[in-house]
């Protein structure tokens, strides 16, 4: 992975701040490439583990079809409240179906607590689960809580 980059107009995260930020159960936005060249962007739950983003979905989804054709993806995770902070990850996605139903339990529990396992089982009973593992090639961060040209709200 390249060194973390920052936008020129605003401070970014340190490595420690990045890990702390990504430990929060924020909503990620995954962008993949459609066959016509347009971008397909969807909200998705994630977990940051061992320097990679793990995203949970089903094999029948458009995002999975897109990744099968072109594994280059972008993921945006931000605070969604002022003063804003966030991370944009550009990387390569790998689809992992090995024990995906179990792996997604920890992701679901980050967002819905003790019911995560039940929800994961219900989805797996209907559709084959898959973990999208994103290996970052470039990370850009922004942290307006450190000051910027944007006034605090």
Where are the language model's segments positioned?
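Charged, gly/pro-rich active-site loop segments
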Residues: 1-13, 85-153
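Short, conserved active-site entrance elements at the starts or edges of catalytic domains
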Residues: 4-32
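Short, solvent-exposed cationic patches
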Residues: 4-10, 60-78, 114-118
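Amphipathic alpha-helical interface surfaces
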Residues: 18, 60-63, 103-107
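Short secondary-structure boundary/capping segments
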Residues: 19-20, 45, 65, 122-124
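Short beta-strand segments
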Residues: 25-59, 67, 73-77, 86-88
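Generic structural signal for secondary-structure transition and capping sites
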Residues: 26-27, 72, 116, 139
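Short, surface-exposed beta-strand-loop junctions and turns on beta-sheet-rich folds
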Residues: 61-63, 82, 148-149
